[in-house]
A protein has these predicted regions:
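Pocket-edge structural micro-motifs
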Residues: 43, 60, 80, 103, ...
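Compact nucleic-acid interaction/catalytic patches
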Residues: 50-53, 58-97
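Generic "edge-of-domain/loop-turn" microfeature
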Residues: 46, 63-64, 83-85, 105-106, ...
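C-terminal terminal-subdomain/extension
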Residues: 2-6, 17, 50, 89-239
């Protein structure tokens, strides 16, 4: 059975609400860098060998973002983001080499307001050069799933449903949410984000017996709410 590329739910004029978890100053500084994050002024090596600042989106798969659960991989795959008009629902199912990012710059009144990430303009950048202070947007889980669907289709011409993508990305996205909440609680106690992240990952990876870890348990949707409650209780106890 074949499937069409999916659009965000709801009316096109409200797609931004479905795509973005947060934009601009609303992005918590302790939110872990994740697939779909958009950064401004990322240093990219041009065809002439010079370095120029570009707006880019992180395209690295969530499971390949970090080597140890804490620190980003040294180099990350990104796609260039550029101005692009808003697509209609019919066009969204076409234009397969890009993903539309309507209202990415919601405060802009020029054509810079609407943009798109282009899958045939890829770069590999040093992760240390991605400044979280210049992060323009984070995607919702649904937004990440739509991004991955379009990327897989661009590379393979196969459409994988977002429902199937959710089944394999849900755990790692939930982990990012838990780390964000943990680091926010720790920040109120004056704990640096890097140290709080290490604490959270260590807690998630603690052996509960027989090699069972909370991190692995997050792969099963049935366990997620319980682990989030336990994480909140742990931060109250620690901080």
């Amino acid at each position: 059975m074949s499937h069409d590329l999916e659009t965000p739910p709801g009316e096109p004029g409200r797609w931004a609400e479905q795509l973005y978890r947060a934009r601009g100053e609303a992005i918590p500084r302790w939110r872990p860098v994740f697939t779909g994050d958009v950064f401004d002024a990322a240093p990219v090596t041009t065809s002439s060998g010079t370095t120029a600042g570009r707006t880019v989106m992180v395209l690295q798969h969530p499971c390949a973002m970090r080597t140890d659960g804490v620190n980003l991989a040294t180099r990350l795959l990104v796609g260039e983001v550029s101005h692009h008009r808003v697509l209609t629902p019919e066009e969204w199912r076409g234009f397969t080499k890009l993903m539309s990012l309507p209202d990415l710059n919601s405060s802009a009144t020029s054509r810079k307001r609407h943009q798109a990430v282009v899958f045939d303009r890829l770069e590999v950048v040093d992760s240390s050069a991605l400044d979280v202070g210049r992060r323009l947007a984070c995607l919702t889980h649904a937004g990440v799933n739509l991004l991955l669907q379009r990327r897989v289709h661009y590379d393979t011409r196969v459409v994988v449903t977002t429902h199937d993508i959710q089944a394999v990305t849900g755990g790692v996205y939930e982990e990012a949410d838990i780390i964000e909440d943990w680091c926010e609680a720790a920040s109120l106690a004056g704990i640096e984000t890097s140290l709080a992240t290490e604490d959270c990952v260590a807690w998630l990876r603690a052996d509960l017996g027989g090699g069972l870890m909370r991190q692995r348990m997050l792969e099963d949707q049935q366990n997620r709410s319980g682990i989030r409650r336990a994480a909140r209780a742990e931060t109250v106890k620690r901080y």
